[in-house]
Amino acid sequence: MIITTTPSIEGKNILEYKGVVFGEVISGVNFIKDFAAGLSNFFGGRSNTYEGELIEAREKAMKEMENRAIQIGANAVVGVDIDYEVLGADNGMLMVTASGTAVYYE
């Protein structure tokens, strides 16, 4: 399946717009990850702990969006946008939303 941020697929003819599809993931961050990330912040450098969590959440949201597109008969998703939001009383949860337009092309 083609998944792209562009509004069209170069060299392809979109025959049908199936509708908007979403993939959402909410991921909690626990104390051990917070502690490891805090050490990284204290000593400088990147937080591999949070980066890994972010990558995993994004990939899951993209896969969920793709699966929803397949369910409605699409073979591509165009105009994809990915949004990130921190949630929870202590900002302890990360929400990743992937959205785009499911299409059928030839």
Swiss-Prot record:
InterPro entries assigned to the protein according to its UniProt record, in alphabetical order? UPF0145_dom_sf, UPF0145_YbjQ-like
Question: So which domain of life are we looking at?
Answer: Bacteria
Q: Which HAMAP family match?
A: UPF0145
PANTHER family referenced in this protein's UniProt entry, alphabetically = UPF0145 PROTEIN YBJQ (PTHR34068:SF1)
Q: Give the record's family classification.
A: Belongs to the UPF0145 family.
Question: What protein does this entry describe?
Answer: UPF0145 protein CLL_A2504
Q: Which organism is it from?
A: Clostridium botulinum (strain Eklund 17B / Type B)
